[in-house]
Amino acid sequence: MAIHLYKTSTPSTRNGTVDSRQVKSNPRNHLIYGQHRCGKGRNARGIITAGHRGGGHKRLYRQIDFRRNEKNIYGRIVTIEYDPNRNASICLIHYGDGEKKYILHPRGAIIGDTIVSGTEVPIKMGNALPLTDMPLGTAIHNIEITLGKGGQLARAAGAVAKLIAKEGKSATLKLPSGEVRLISKNCSATVGQVGNVGVNQKNLGRAGSKCWLGKRPIVRGVVMNPVDHPHGGGEGRAPIGRKKPATPWGFPALGRRSRKRKKYSDNLILRRRTK
Protein backbone atom coordinates (compact mmCIF):
# COMPACT_ATOMS: atom_id res chain seq x y z
CA MET A 1 0.00 0.00 0.00
CA ALA A 2 1.47 3.35 -1.09
CA ILE A 3 0.27 6.31 0.99
CA HIS A 4 0.38 9.72 -0.69
CA LEU A 5 -0.62 13.13 0.68
CA TYR A 6 -3.19 15.42 -0.90
CA LYS A 7 -2.25 18.93 -1.94
CA THR A 8 -3.24 21.33 0.84
CA SER A 9 -5.95 23.10 -1.13
CA THR A 10 -8.69 22.81 1.53
CA PRO A 11 -8.69 22.15 5.30
CA SER A 12 -10.03 18.64 4.77
CA THR A 13 -7.31 17.67 2.31
CA ARG A 14 -4.54 19.27 4.37
CA ASN A 15 -4.12 16.16 6.49
CA GLY A 16 -5.78 13.60 4.22
CA THR A 17 -4.01 10.71 2.52
CA VAL A 18 -4.86 8.48 -0.42
CA ASP A 19 -3.80 5.00 -1.54
CA SER A 20 -2.21 5.37 -4.95
CA ARG A 21 -2.40 1.62 -5.70
CA GLN A 22 -6.14 1.36 -5.19
CA VAL A 23 -7.74 0.13 -8.43
CA LYS A 24 -11.30 1.08 -9.31
CA SER A 25 -13.13 -1.75 -11.05
CA ASN A 26 -16.67 -3.05 -11.08
CA PRO A 27 -17.14 -6.25 -9.03
CA ARG A 28 -18.40 -9.37 -10.80
CA ASN A 29 -22.18 -9.71 -10.56
CA HIS A 30 -22.16 -13.43 -9.73
CA LEU A 31 -19.78 -12.83 -6.81
CA ILE A 32 -21.72 -10.07 -5.04
CA TYR A 33 -25.06 -9.74 -3.31
CA GLY A 34 -26.84 -7.05 -1.36
CA GLN A 35 -27.09 -7.08 2.39
CA HIS A 36 -29.35 -5.29 4.84
CA ARG A 37 -27.13 -3.86 7.56
CA CYS A 38 -29.79 -3.95 10.24
CA GLY A 39 -29.21 -2.75 13.77
CA LYS A 40 -25.91 -0.92 13.31
CA GLY A 41 -24.84 -1.43 16.90
CA ARG A 42 -28.34 -2.06 18.31
CA ASN A 43 -29.88 -5.24 19.61
CA ALA A 44 -33.38 -6.57 18.88
CA ARG A 45 -34.90 -4.00 21.27
CA GLY A 46 -33.12 -1.08 19.62
CA ILE A 47 -30.73 -0.52 22.54
CA ILE A 48 -27.12 0.38 21.77
CA THR A 49 -24.86 -2.58 22.53
CA ALA A 50 -21.87 -1.57 20.34
CA GLY A 51 -21.18 2.14 20.35
CA HIS A 52 -19.98 4.50 17.64
CA ARG A 53 -21.73 2.68 14.79
CA GLY A 54 -24.41 3.90 12.42
CA GLY A 55 -25.03 5.42 9.03
CA GLY A 56 -22.52 4.81 6.28
CA HIS A 57 -22.72 4.15 2.58
CA LYS A 58 -24.58 1.16 1.16
CA ARG A 59 -22.41 -1.87 0.56
CA LEU A 60 -22.43 -4.89 -1.71
CA TYR A 61 -20.93 -7.97 -0.12
CA ARG A 62 -18.18 -9.71 -2.07
CA GLN A 63 -18.12 -13.49 -1.69
CA ILE A 64 -14.58 -14.33 -0.62
CA ASP A 65 -13.22 -17.85 -1.13
CA PHE A 66 -11.85 -18.59 2.33
CA ARG A 67 -11.96 -22.37 1.73
CA ARG A 68 -9.78 -22.42 -1.41
CA ASN A 69 -11.58 -25.49 -2.77
CA GLU A 70 -10.07 -25.35 -6.27
CA LYS A 71 -7.51 -28.08 -5.59
CA ASN A 72 -4.50 -28.45 -7.91
CA ILE A 73 -5.96 -25.98 -10.42
CA TYR A 74 -3.80 -22.98 -11.19
CA GLY A 75 -5.38 -19.55 -11.13
CA ARG A 76 -4.22 -16.15 -12.33
CA ILE A 77 -4.67 -12.82 -10.53
CA VAL A 78 -6.69 -10.56 -12.83
CA THR A 79 -7.56 -7.55 -10.64
CA ILE A 80 -6.75 -6.15 -7.20
CA GLU A 81 -9.86 -4.42 -5.88
CA TYR A 82 -11.15 -2.43 -2.93
CA ASP A 83 -13.58 -4.18 -0.59
CA PRO A 84 -15.82 -1.96 1.56
CA ASN A 85 -16.49 -4.81 4.00
CA ARG A 86 -12.89 -5.23 5.22
CA ASN A 87 -9.67 -3.26 5.50
CA ALA A 88 -7.74 -5.73 3.34
CA SER A 89 -7.83 -5.64 -0.44
CA ILE A 90 -9.17 -8.55 -2.50
CA CYS A 91 -8.08 -9.96 -5.84
CA LEU A 92 -10.08 -11.72 -8.54
CA ILE A 93 -8.75 -15.11 -9.60
CA HIS A 94 -9.42 -16.76 -12.97
CA TYR A 95 -8.88 -20.53 -12.63
CA GLY A 96 -7.99 -22.89 -15.42
CA ASP A 97 -11.37 -24.64 -15.30
CA GLY A 98 -13.23 -21.36 -15.89
CA GLU A 99 -14.12 -20.58 -12.27
CA LYS A 100 -13.77 -16.99 -11.02
CA LYS A 101 -13.41 -16.29 -7.31
CA TYR A 102 -12.26 -13.58 -4.92
CA ILE A 103 -9.52 -14.20 -2.36
CA LEU A 104 -7.69 -11.99 0.12
CA HIS A 105 -4.85 -10.14 -1.54
CA PRO A 106 -1.47 -11.48 -0.35
CA ARG A 107 1.19 -8.87 0.25
CA GLY A 108 3.46 -8.49 -2.77
CA ALA A 109 1.16 -10.26 -5.22
CA ILE A 110 0.67 -8.43 -8.51
CA ILE A 111 -1.64 -8.82 -11.48
CA GLY A 112 -0.57 -11.77 -13.60
CA ASP A 113 0.79 -13.93 -10.77
CA THR A 114 -0.40 -17.53 -10.53
CA ILE A 115 -1.58 -19.31 -7.38
CA VAL A 116 -2.71 -22.84 -6.56
CA SER A 117 -4.07 -24.78 -3.60
CA GLY A 118 -3.55 -28.44 -2.78
CA THR A 119 -1.55 -30.90 -0.70
CA GLU A 120 1.79 -30.91 -2.51
CA VAL A 121 2.14 -27.40 -3.91
CA PRO A 122 5.16 -25.07 -3.76
CA ILE A 123 5.68 -22.90 -0.67
CA LYS A 124 4.93 -19.71 -2.55
CA MET A 125 3.09 -16.53 -1.63
CA GLY A 126 -0.65 -16.97 -2.19
CA ASN A 127 -0.64 -20.77 -2.35
CA ALA A 128 -2.89 -22.65 0.09
CA LEU A 129 -1.98 -26.01 1.59
CA PRO A 130 -2.33 -27.98 4.86
CA LEU A 131 -0.11 -27.08 7.79
CA THR A 132 1.41 -30.57 7.77
CA ASP A 133 3.04 -29.84 4.40
CA MET A 134 4.58 -26.52 5.47
CA PRO A 135 8.10 -26.14 6.89
CA LEU A 136 8.59 -24.55 10.29
CA GLY A 137 8.87 -20.78 10.30
CA THR A 138 6.47 -20.27 7.39
CA ALA A 139 4.51 -17.01 7.45
CA ILE A 140 0.82 -17.73 6.86
CA HIS A 141 -2.63 -16.12 6.92
CA ASN A 142 -6.28 -17.14 6.40
CA ILE A 143 -5.91 -20.10 8.77
CA GLU A 144 -8.60 -22.70 9.36
CA ILE A 145 -9.69 -23.59 12.89
CA THR A 146 -12.11 -26.33 11.85
CA LEU A 147 -11.16 -28.56 8.94
CA GLY A 148 -13.12 -27.65 5.81
CA LYS A 149 -14.83 -24.61 7.30
CA GLY A 150 -12.52 -22.08 5.68
CA GLY A 151 -9.99 -19.64 7.02
CA GLN A 152 -10.96 -17.74 10.17
CA LEU A 153 -7.67 -16.49 11.66
CA ALA A 154 -5.27 -13.77 10.43
CA ARG A 155 -7.52 -12.22 7.79
CA ALA A 156 -7.17 -8.48 8.54
CA ALA A 157 -4.93 -6.15 6.56
CA GLY A 158 -1.27 -6.82 7.34
CA ALA A 159 -2.05 -9.87 9.50
CA VAL A 160 0.45 -12.72 9.53
CA ALA A 161 0.94 -15.78 11.74
CA LYS A 162 3.94 -18.06 12.10
CA LEU A 163 4.18 -21.85 12.19
CA ILE A 164 6.58 -22.58 15.05
CA ALA A 165 6.14 -26.30 15.83
CA LYS A 166 4.48 -29.54 14.76
CA GLU A 167 3.91 -32.44 17.13
CA GLY A 168 1.50 -35.35 16.86
CA LYS A 169 -1.78 -34.28 15.29
CA SER A 170 -1.37 -30.60 16.15
CA ALA A 171 0.61 -27.63 14.91
CA THR A 172 1.66 -24.70 17.08
CA LEU A 173 1.03 -21.22 15.69
CA LYS A 174 1.95 -17.77 16.90
CA LEU A 175 -0.95 -15.49 15.96
CA PRO A 176 -0.77 -11.75 15.19
CA SER A 177 -2.07 -10.95 18.70
CA GLY A 178 0.89 -12.77 20.28
CA GLU A 179 -1.25 -15.73 21.31
CA VAL A 180 0.30 -19.18 20.90
CA ARG A 181 -2.21 -21.95 20.29
CA LEU A 182 -2.63 -25.43 18.84
CA ILE A 183 -4.46 -26.20 15.60
CA SER A 184 -4.93 -29.46 13.72
CA LYS A 185 -2.17 -30.15 11.20
CA ASN A 186 -4.78 -31.05 8.60
CA CYS A 187 -6.19 -27.51 8.56
CA SER A 188 -5.21 -25.34 5.62
CA ALA A 189 -3.64 -21.90 5.47
CA THR A 190 -2.36 -19.50 2.84
CA VAL A 191 1.33 -18.71 2.54
CA GLY A 192 2.36 -15.10 3.05
CA GLN A 193 1.01 -11.97 4.70
CA VAL A 194 -2.26 -10.18 4.02
CA GLY A 195 -1.74 -7.09 1.87
CA ASN A 196 -2.67 -3.45 2.47
CA VAL A 197 -0.18 -3.28 5.34
CA GLY A 198 -0.17 0.52 5.71
CA VAL A 199 -3.90 0.89 6.22
CA ASN A 200 -3.38 2.00 9.84
CA GLN A 201 -1.27 4.92 8.61
CA LYS A 202 -4.04 6.25 6.39
CA ASN A 203 -5.52 9.58 7.51
CA LEU A 204 -9.06 10.25 6.34
CA GLY A 205 -8.61 13.99 6.84
CA ARG A 206 -12.18 14.88 7.83
CA ALA A 207 -15.13 13.62 9.83
CA GLY A 208 -17.33 13.07 6.80
CA SER A 209 -15.06 10.37 5.42
CA LYS A 210 -15.34 8.56 8.74
CA CYS A 211 -19.14 8.77 8.60
CA TRP A 212 -19.15 7.17 5.14
CA LEU A 213 -17.54 4.11 6.73
CA GLY A 214 -20.40 3.79 9.24
CA LYS A 215 -18.40 5.06 12.22
CA ARG A 216 -19.97 7.70 14.48
CA PRO A 217 -18.16 10.16 16.77
CA ILE A 218 -16.58 8.88 19.99
CA VAL A 219 -17.66 10.93 23.03
CA ARG A 220 -15.83 10.70 26.37
CA GLY A 221 -17.91 9.60 29.32
CA VAL A 222 -16.55 12.37 31.55
CA VAL A 223 -18.29 15.04 29.45
CA MET A 224 -21.69 13.29 29.61
CA ASN A 225 -24.46 13.65 32.15
CA PRO A 226 -24.70 11.22 35.09
CA VAL A 227 -27.74 9.60 33.48
CA ASP A 228 -25.68 8.67 30.42
CA HIS A 229 -22.38 7.45 31.91
CA PRO A 230 -20.89 6.65 35.35
CA HIS A 231 -18.09 9.17 34.65
CA GLY A 232 -20.55 11.98 33.89
CA GLY A 233 -21.64 14.92 35.99
CA GLY A 234 -19.81 17.34 38.24
CA GLU A 235 -19.06 21.03 38.01
CA GLY A 236 -16.77 21.91 35.14
CA ARG A 237 -13.92 19.54 34.40
CA ALA A 238 -14.52 17.10 37.21
CA PRO A 239 -12.76 13.73 37.66
CA ILE A 240 -14.65 10.49 37.13
CA GLY A 241 -15.51 10.26 40.84
CA ARG A 242 -14.54 6.63 41.41
CA LYS A 243 -11.41 4.57 41.98
CA LYS A 244 -11.43 2.74 38.65
CA PRO A 245 -12.94 3.58 35.25
CA ALA A 246 -16.16 1.90 34.21
CA THR A 247 -18.16 1.17 31.07
CA PRO A 248 -21.47 2.97 30.39
CA TRP A 249 -23.19 0.04 32.12
CA GLY A 250 -21.02 0.19 35.25
CA PHE A 251 -18.71 -2.75 34.59
CA PRO A 252 -14.93 -2.38 35.10
CA ALA A 253 -13.12 -1.03 32.05
CA LEU A 254 -9.59 -0.50 30.75
CA GLY A 255 -7.64 -3.59 31.71
CA ARG A 256 -10.20 -6.08 32.99
CA ARG A 257 -10.10 -9.34 31.06
CA SER A 258 -13.43 -10.13 29.47
CA ARG A 259 -12.80 -13.60 28.05
CA LYS A 260 -15.15 -16.33 29.28
CA ARG A 261 -13.57 -18.55 31.92
CA LYS A 262 -14.86 -21.83 30.49
CA LYS A 263 -14.32 -22.20 26.77
CA TYR A 264 -13.61 -25.17 24.53
CA SER A 265 -10.33 -23.65 23.33
CA ASP A 266 -8.79 -23.16 26.80
CA ASN A 267 -6.77 -26.37 26.43
CA LEU A 268 -5.56 -25.32 22.97
CA ILE A 269 -4.13 -21.96 24.03
CA LEU A 270 -0.57 -22.34 25.26
CA ARG A 271 -0.01 -18.63 25.90
CA ARG A 272 -2.56 -15.86 26.14
CA ARG A 273 -2.38 -12.91 23.80
CA THR A 274 -0.29 -9.92 24.80
CA LYS A 275 -1.51 -6.35 24.96
Swiss-Prot record:
Q: Name one Pfam family in it.
A: Ribosomal_L2
What subcellular compartments does it reside in?
Plastid, Chloroplast
Q: What GO molecular function terms would the record report?
A: rRNA binding; structural constituent of ribosome; transferase activity
Query: Sorted alphabetically, which keywords does the UniProt record give?
Result: Chloroplast, Plastid, Ribonucleoprotein, Ribosomal protein
Q: Which InterPro entries match?
A: NA-bd_OB-fold (IPR012340), Rib_uL2_dom2 (IPR014722), Ribosomal_uL2 (IPR002171), Ribosomal_uL2_bac/org-type (IPR005880), Ribosomal_uL2_C (IPR022669), Ribosomal_uL2_CS (IPR022671), Ribosomal_uL2_dom3 (IPR014726), Ribosomal_uL2_RNA-bd_dom (IPR022666)
PROSITE patterns (UniProt xref) = RIBOSOMAL_L2 (PS00467)
One cellular component (GO) term of this entry: chloroplast
Specify where the region named Disordered lies, as residue ranges. Answer: 1-26, 224-275
**GO terms for biological process, alphabetical:** mitochondrial translation
For bias type Polar residues, the affected ranges are 7-26
Location (main, coarse): plastid
Q: Which family does it belong to?
A: Belongs to the universal ribosomal protein uL2 family.
Query: What HAMAP family has UniProt attached to this entry?
Result: Ribosomal_uL2_B
On assembly, the entry states: Part of the 50S ribosomal subunit.
What is the protein name stated in its UniProt record? Large ribosomal subunit protein uL2cz/uL2cy
Species assigned in the record:
Phaseolus angularis (Azuki bean)
Q: Organism classification, top ranks?
A: Eukaryota, Viridiplantae, Streptophyta, Embryophyta, Tracheophyta
